[in-house]
Amino acid sequence: MISHNDPKFLFVHLPKNAGSSVTKVLANYIGVDREELRPQKYKFIYARDIPKVLDNKQDDYFIFSVVRNPWERTVSYFHYLQQIRQPPHNLDKNVKFSNWVRAGGHRGLQTQMSQLADKFPCSVSTHIDYIARLERLGEEWPKVCEKMGIQCDMMHDKKSKHQNYSDYYDQFTKDIIYKFYKNDVDCLNYEFNKE
């Protein structure tokens, strides 16, 4: 989560969904260090906690988040774990994606809807004003900025380089991810694409 009072915004950061990029861009725009926008107490929040975090002044803020295709997000998480060097989260570079999924490695990345839903599993919280899709962030970022009353360009930070996510999956692992992230797939209208 990052928030600021001028302009008044709160970004609900979902891991592996361009959170570092959004934080960096907004920190640069405001002219502060990105850590100043990220209170450690509320690094990742749930939508139901927004009123508490903002002292019940959520109506004064533009609240947004970014979602991502669950299959692509899982591949990104896998590569992230291979890059970090902090046990116990680091993952050996020789581990195959399919073996990692079959062993349940993906379960370390919670569902997006678990953070975005309020009372019902498939209903985005009424506290969230806008949900951008990572796949269209270039098109959607100007809308986000307009709603905050600012102008700044999006740039990607920590973008992982890998082949198309669909190349990582066989039918079995594709189904594992679908079952685990079913609410994300169904509620956020995602599908597995071979593009």
PLM features: residue spans?
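Membrane-interface amphipathic segments in extracytoplasmic regions
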Residues: 1-195
